């Protein structure tokens, strides 16, 4: 892996299933990146993730196009929503979003990403809960959404 040009860090997996980051150059603890008009905080975590899955950007583009062209308000249920890449994209396109994840820390980071993108005043509900249990309660309540992201 050291042969990669410009390599700044590498992830070393442990036998127990976790791992650690090894920094080859001075590296910030966290930083902000931009994708179009969206902004996200990146922070390497102990389970190999950085808080964002950039390969999902093509899906964010599709969602944004569908929402913008719907011609009516769209409500989105984002399940297992992590740090909110899809939530930010949908809010930026004009949707209202219900963001659900079991991890309080990830939901807090999603809120931070929403605010970083200048969308803090947009209609979003943050729910810290088991997604399956939440969906069962939503069905009992008769609450429906135009789109569900998983």
What are these regions (language model features)?
Residues 83-95:
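Conserved SAM-binding loop of SAM-dependent methyltransferases across substrates and taxa
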Residues 96-101:
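Conserved SAM-binding motif I beta-strand of class I
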Residues 87, 145-150:
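Conserved active-site beta-strand-loop modules that form the wall/rim of enzyme catalytic pockets
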Residues 1-54, 61:
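Non-catalytic substrate-recognition/targeting regions of SAM-dependent transferases
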Residues 54-72:
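Conserved alpha-helix/loop element of class I SAM-dependent methyltransferases that forms part
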Residues 71-82:
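Conserved class I S-adenosyl-L-methionine
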Residues 75-77, 127, 148-150:
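Residue-level marker for buried hydrophobic side chains located in beta-strands
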């Amino acid at each position: 892996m050291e042969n990669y040009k410009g390599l700044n860090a590498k992830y070393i997996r442990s036998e127990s299933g976790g791992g650690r980051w090894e920094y080859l150059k001075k590296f910030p603890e966290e930083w902000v990146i931009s994708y179009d008009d969206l902004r996200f905080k990146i922070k390497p975590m102990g389970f190999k993730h950085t808080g964002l899955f950039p390969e999902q950007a093509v899906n964010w583009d599709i969602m944004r196009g569908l929402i913008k062209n719907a011609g009516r308000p769209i409500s989105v249920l984002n399940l297992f929503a992590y740090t909110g890449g899809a939530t930010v994209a949908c809010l930026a396109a004009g949707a209202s979003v219900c963001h659900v994840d079991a991890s309080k820390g990830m939901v807090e980071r999603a809120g931070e990403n929403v605010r970083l993108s200048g969308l803090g005043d947009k209609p979003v509900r943050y729910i810290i809960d088991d997604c399956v249990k939440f969906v069962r309660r939503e069905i009992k309540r008769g609450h429906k959404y135009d789109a569900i992201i998983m």
